Amino acid sequence: MLDNHTIAIVKSTIPLLAETGPKLTAHFYDRMFTHNPELKDIFNMSNQRNGDQREALFNAICAYATNIENLAALLPAVERIAQKHTSFNIQADQYQIVGNHLLATLDEMFSPGQEVLDAWGKAYGVLANVFIQREDDIYRSTETKTGGWSGVRPFRIVNKQLQSSVITSFTLEPTDGQPIADFQPGQYLAIYIKHDSFANQEIRQYSLTHAPNGKSYRIAVKREAQGTVSGYLHDTAREGDIVHLAAPHGDFFLDIPTDTPVALISGGVGQTPMLGMLHTLKQQDHQAKVLWLHAAENGTAHAFTDEIEQTGQALPHFDHHIWYREPQQTDRPGEDYHHSGLMQLASLKGELTTPDMHYYLCGPVVFMQFVAQQLLAMGIPAEQLHYECFGPHKVV
């Protein structure tokens, strides 16, 4: 526990942090990667270049300083980050490295004096221990469960299939032929790739797109403009190639009784965790209403269309609505899609305000914000909305 004097000192630095903004974390990351370049094998350097990770860390530091007297308010964020950390195989000793560079950054940018540095050192130590303990629990659970493992495990690509103009799916089986760990629908895999064309090892996380079967995993990857890993997987990876995976992780997953109505709402490649949820609902013989709402650019970018329709038909109360932002001439209204333009939900208010319905959202942040605002305006309680951001977390 932190004493009141330490808490007061940390809180007194909040205005300075807010004024500095993400320049603080830019300095931190530049310093850390200069002194500990081996950490480039863990961090997504694309997120460093576009500033997303720097912004996310800055927001996390400010949130911690603001809530330092109420750590319970941070527990959802701690769980989300701990799940990501364990997929990256973060170890306890790496927290010491991060802490050293954080304090050095504060000193180099602000020269706040030893009392402030000592207070932040204590505060960081408390938070680091929270993460270390939670991550240790996750590691033990992952390793000891049926089919589980620690670290990474080699898998073979047994099927590679183009699902749309921008999305390709990969089915992966363990090279040792042994069982693999089950997962919650909506969770993701971390894939570790080393290639001669890469400056560093690259780790990416991709949602699982099927229900657990104990034998294989399936992910789907969107080709990103200038994406290092997505470009490699689309253009270079072949069936028979070996990749290394961490066990499934993630705090965004379907967890409702079979009599609870659910809406699965996605934009673009955000449908991938929803697809895993849909297959699981079928596997569980879900009896309540299931709404599938999806927005795509057009028919060429719309993936898994037949699979979704066939899976939905096996559910007793399934309905779906598809939006194409800019339909092509070959896209058939009423068959390929039902609405054009953005996902406007007013016409579906009767279906969406079903009592006790839960809503799962995934897609671009602006898409999820747009949808969430509409749902909240309908009077839907915020606690019934669940969402996942691909990449560094942002508030919807």
Swiss-Prot record:
NCBIfam families reported for this sequence: PRK13289.1 (NF009805)
Matches recorded under Pfam families:
FAD_binding_6, Globin, NAD_binding_1
Lineage runs: Bacteria, Pseudomonadati, Pseudomonadota, Gammaproteobacteria, Enterobacterales
Identify the residues that bind NADP(+): 268-273
Q: How is the cofactor bound?
A: Binds 1 heme b (iron(II)-protoporphyrin IX) group per subunit.
In its UniProt record, which GO terms are filed under biological process?
cellular response to nitrosative stress; nitric oxide catabolic process; response to toxic substance
Keywords linked to the UniProt accession: Detoxification, FAD, Flavoprotein, Heme, Iron, Metal-binding, NAD, NADP, Oxidoreductase, Oxygen transport, Transport
Coiled coil feature spans:
none
Give the superkingdom in one word: Bacteria
Site entry: Influences the redox potential of the prosthetic heme and FAD groups: 84, 388
What does the sequence similarity comment in the record state about its family?
Answer: Belongs to the globin family. Two-domain flavohemoproteins subfamily.
Mind telling me what this protein is named?
Answer: Flavohemoprotein
Q: Which cofactor does it need?
A: heme b; FAD
Q: Does the keyword RNA-binding apply?
A: no
Region listing for Reductase, in residue ranges: 147-396
Catalysed reaction(s) here are: 2 nitric oxide + NADPH + 2 O2 = 2 nitrate + NADP(+) + H(+); 2 nitric oxide + NADH + 2 O2 = 2 nitrate + NAD(+) + H(+)
Source species of the chain: Pectobacterium atrosepticum (strain SCRI 1043 / ATCC BAA-672) (Erwinia carotovora subsp. atroseptica)
